[in-house]
Amino acid sequence: MVGIVVVSHSNKLAEEIINFAKVLQQEDFEIKNGGDVKNEVYGTNIDNVKDAIIEADQGEGVLVFVDMGSSVFNANQAIESLKGKINAQIADAPLVEGVISAVAANFDDISLEELKIIAEESRNFKKSKK
């Protein structure tokens, strides 16, 4: 199964997104918080993201979700440092909708690439007809 990592500047936000998404989880795969889970601080760093990717990997790759700014930079750096060891990619998707879509679709041996497409399609969800 594809692992999933959520990287947010707020650990509490990432944890709540993960808790909510787990309600839709159909298979056994890892969903990890890539933030600084040991401290109640805001921000991200490369080491925490890298550790979360390693923990989430079950051999089929890891899809990483980020909120903004340094989370994007740190996730890219962490992925680069793991190149050749773990296939990890960032989903260019809204954080909440993307994670929920990916968790709900992560079953039946879906590939990392297929899951990324599904997550990124969440950018097109309309919340209003106006």
Predicted regions and their residues:
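N-terminal loops that bind phosphate or other acidic moieties
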Residues: 2-130
